[in-house]
C-alpha cells in the first residue's frame, strides 16, 4: 500500500508548484529582479512561506532569479523549486486542522476533474508528467479554481502554525490504516490488476482514462469519510512522502 500511496499523493499535489511557477513566469518579463519578491507577495502561499520559512523563501527567490538570468527553461525552474515546496506542504499537512487538510485535497481533486474534462490524455499528463510530458494547467483551469487552490495552500500552511494546530498520534495512524484498507480493497476488487497502474503509470499508456478515473475514485472515497477520518488518511498518505 505504501508505494501506491506515495505515487498517488505526489502526483495530485505537484500542480500547486506548477501554478506558482506560471504566476512567476507571467511577471518575470515585466519585473526587475529586485522587485520580484514584492510581486510574488500577491500570492497567498508565498506570503506564508516568507513568514514561516524566511531562509527557504530567500533560497527559492535566489534560485528562480539565477535560473531566469541563465535563460533556463520553464521545466528546469519547476524541477528545482518543486521538491522544496512539496516537502514543506507535506510537513504542514501533519499539523494542519482537519478542515484545512480535507479542503486542500478536495481542491486538488477539483483540479484533476476539470482537466479530465479537457481530455483523458491531458489528465494523465497532469498527474504523471514524467511519463508523457506535463501540461500547463493555467491553459485549462479557470482563474477562480486556481485562485481557490492557492488560497487553500496558504490557509492550510498558516493553520498548521495556528491555535488549532494538530498533533498526529499513533492512534490516529492506526485508525487511518484501518479506514483506508476497505477503500483499497474495493478498488482492487473493481479494477483487478489494473490497480497496479497507480504505482506504475509508465505501463498505463493506452489506459489514460482508467488511470485518471482510479486516482479520482480513490480520493473521492477518502473524502467521503467523516472529516476527522478523511484528514487522518490524508496525513497518513503524505507522511510517506516526507
Where are these regions (language model features)?
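Generic structural signal for hydrophobic core residues of well-folded globular domains
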Residues: 64-67, 89, 93, 131, ...
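Hydrophobic membrane-insertion alpha-helices, especially the h-region
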Residues: 7-23
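A cross-kingdom marker for long, charged
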Residues: 194-242
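Extended amphipathic alpha-helical interaction segments
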Residues: 117-203
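Positively charged n-region of N-terminal signal peptides that target proteins for export
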Residues: 1-4
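Residues that cap or delimit alpha-helices
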Residues: 89-120, 142-146, 188, 192-193, ...
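Residue-level detector of alpha-helical secondary structure
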Residues: 37-40, 50, 57, 61-68, ...
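N-terminal Sec/ER secretory leader and immediately downstream segment
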Residues: 20-131
Amino acid at each position: 500500500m505504501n508505494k501506491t500511496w506515495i505515487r498517488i499523493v505526489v502526483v495530485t499535489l505537484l500542480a500547486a508548484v506548477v501554478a506558482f511557477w506560471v504566476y512567476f513566469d507571467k511577471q518575470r518579463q515585466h519585473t526587475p529582479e529586485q522587485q520580484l519578491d514584492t510581486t510574488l507577495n500577491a500570492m497567498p502561499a508565498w506570503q506564508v512561506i516568507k513568514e514561516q520559512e524566511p531562509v527557504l523563501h530567500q533560497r527559492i527567490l535566489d534560485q528562480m532569479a539565477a535560473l531566469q538570468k541563465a535563460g533556463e527553461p520553464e521545466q528546469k525552474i519547476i524541477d528545482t523549486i518543486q521538491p522544496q515546496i512539496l516537502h514543506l506542504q507535506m510537513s504542514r499537512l501533519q499539523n494542519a486542522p482537519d478542515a484545512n487538510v480535507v479542503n486542500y485535497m478536495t481542491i486538488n481533486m477539483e483540479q484533476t476533474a476539470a482537466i479530465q474534462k479537457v481530455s483523458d490524455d491531458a489528465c494523465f499528463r497532469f498527474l504523471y508528467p514524467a511519463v508523457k510530458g506535463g501540461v500547463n494547467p493555467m491553459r485549462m483551469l479557470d482563474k477562480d479554481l486556481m485562485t481557490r487552490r492557492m488560497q487553500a495552500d496558504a490557509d492550510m500552511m498558516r493553520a498548521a502554525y495556528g491555535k488549532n494546530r494538530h498533533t498526529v498520534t499513533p492512534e490516529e495512524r492506526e485508525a487511518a490504516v484501518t479506514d483506508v484498507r476497505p477503500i483499497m480493497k474495493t478498488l482492487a476488487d473493481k479494477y483487478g490488476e489494473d490497480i497496479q497502474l497507480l504505482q506504475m503509470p509508465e505501463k498505463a499508456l493506452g489506459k489514460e482514462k482508467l488511470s485518471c478515473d482510479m486516482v479520482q475514485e480513490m480520493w473521492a472515497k477518502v473524502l467521503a469519510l467523516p472529516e476527522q477520518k478523511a484528514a487522518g488518511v490524508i496525513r497518513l498518505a503524505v507522511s510517506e512522502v516526507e
